[in-house]
Amino acid sequence: MKVSAALLCLLLTTAAFSTQVLAQPVSISTVCCFNVASRKISFQRLQSYRKITSSKCPQKAVIFKTKQAKKICADPKQKWVQDAMKYLDENSRTTKYSSF
């Protein structure tokens, strides 16, 4: 009887700890920009972009990906950055519709 009670306690303890481990959130890495491009990048070199708005980052930024797979941080307040995002948005829309 003592052995079965001890086994039951061990089983319940193991079950309690395993559910706590499973319930923990998955760690997602945050990408931040600490320096931004100081000059304009040719729109034709750009392939895509991603906005960085995480509160964990020191500043808001846009990461442009070039056709050569380089990633470049830029200040989203600058006019050329806004124009580049608009250019990429329009090109991606045109590409989607022209494939029919």
Swiss-Prot record:
The keyword Transmembrane does not apply. In response to the presence of allergens, this protein directly promotes the accumulation of eosinophils (a prominent feature of allergic inflammatory reactions), but not lymphocytes, macrophages or neutrophils. Binds to CCR3. Disulfide bonds join 32-57, 33-73. GO terms for biological process: antimicrobial humoral immune response mediated by antimicrobial peptide; chemokine-mediated signaling pathway; eosinophil chemotaxis; inflammatory response; positive regulation of cell migration. InterPro entries: Chemokine_b/g/d, Chemokine_CC_CS, Chemokine_IL8-like_dom, Interleukin_8-like_sf. GO terms for molecular function: CCR chemokine receptor binding; chemokine activity. Belongs to the intercrine beta (chemokine CC) family. Residues 1-23 form the signal peptide. Keywords: Chemotaxis, Cytokine, Disulfide bond, Glycoprotein, Inflammatory response, Secreted, Signal. Its main location: secreted. Glycans are attached at residue 94. It is found in: Secreted. This is Eotaxin. One of its GO terms (cellular component) is extracellular space.
